[in-house]
Each structure stands twice: as structure tokens, then as C-alpha cells.
Amino acid sequence: RVRAEDQVTSLYGALGNYLTRNGLTLQDVRRIVLTGVGASYTEGDIFGIPTCKVDEFSASAAGALALSGREQGVVVTMGTGTAFLWAEQNGTVRHLCGSGIGGGTMGGLCRKLVGMERFGQIRELARQGDLSKVDLTIKDISQNPAATLDPDLTAANFGNLAEDATPADLAAGVVNLVLQAVGIMTVLACQACNTDTVILTGAMTTMPQAVENFQNFQRLFGYQYVIPENATFATAIGAALCSLRDTPDNNP
């Protein structure tokens, strides 16, 4: 990851980093494809290399379907915030809704609560945490919950915060809050689209808690949650695929 004060500096830094890590030069690059909100900050070709832009939603949808091998489904891109799309292999892409809860939420809360904002640091710290010292569960408030309610379900995020909660416990609570908020919205999206398939992409999919969290949603609601290989790079891969589809040539 390249950290910079502005989008353009980040772009050029990321490109240089990619070339260096892969032993490439600018002469090896035949096309540059930009996507995401940061793409709006640049115009024209980069370093004289043919450069084009692809709509982020189209890129995310194409990448998710290609990596998962699914014909259609709800695509969830968990980035700084979270976007929910309906996507089909025939090219249909519909933006369902979005949420301000995502990786940015996790980073901001953890910076204040535990003094960390780096994704890797939070991921490792949260793995050591105990959610029972942070969250209130159904079994904490009811001896006879409804049949549709698992006793271990969260009744209130941060609703049972212990005085001796450690930084690891707090980090685990933040990660759980973000993943569960996203999970609930996937249920609503599936109901709206009459589908049972959810394809998850973005950096948050690499959190160890992500698999367990969405397995719980799958068990409770019967939807299929797919985290494809290379899900972190789904939007970038989709941008490349869209570019090849829209402007095919002999030198991809």
C-alpha cells in the first residue's frame, strides 16, 4: 500500500512500486486502466502510456463475477465504505445502495480506541480479542429466545463493554461491528433482488473474522456467501476486463 497526501501522488507512487516489485519498466506497460473515485483526479495519458478509465461499479461487478464464476448475484465491495451491486454476466450492473460503514470506519475507530489504523496491525490485534468483553449477545439478555434467534447472535455491538477490556478486545469489537453491519445489509439486498448469492470483495475479505461472520449469516439466512480467490483485487481485475471488452486490440 502506498500512502500519500493526495490521489495523484498515490497513483504515481503505486505504479512505481508495482513496476519495481515485479521487475518491470514503463516500456513493458502497454495500457493503464484507472477506476475508483481517485480516477477523477487525472486526465490524459500517464507517462505517455495509453490510459483509460472504467466506471468503478462496472469494474467491481465484472471482477466479482469473473473471479467467482457466478452468473449473477449481489456484489459487495468492502473498501473505505461499502457498495452493494446487482450484477449479471450479460453486463447488467445496478447500484443497489451503499454504506459509510467499511474499512474507513474500522481504521478511524481503532485509531481512537487502540492507537492503530494500519489494516495489518488491526487484523492481527483483533485476532487476539475476546468479543464477550465487548458485545452483548442474545443469551445475555434472554433465557428463552425466539426459535429464529441464535443465542450467540449479537444483540448490541459494544453493549457489554467490560472495564478490563483490552485493546485486542476493542479491536475485535470494531471489526465485528463493521462485518455484521455489512452482513445485515447483504440480507436486505438479497431480499430486494430475490437471490441467494452474495459475492464479497475488497480488503475486508482478508480479515480472519470475515469468513466466520459470513458463515453465520449463511447458516441463519440460507444465502450463499462467496469470497473468491484474489477478492481484494476484484475491482482492478474487473477494470482490466472491461477495458479489454470495450477497446479490444492486439496489445492488451
Residue ranges of model-derived segments:
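Short glycine-rich, Thr/Ser-proximal phosphate-binding strand/loop in the N-terminal lobe
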Residues: 1-13, 93
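Phosphate/pyrophosphate-binding loops at sites that engage ATP/ADP/AMP, CoA/4′-phosphopantetheine
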Residues: 15-30, 185-197
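Glycine-rich phosphate-binding loop plus the immediately following alpha-helix
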Residues: 90-146
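Adenine-nucleotide phosphate-binding core of ATP-dependent small-molecule kinases
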Residues: 147-197, 232
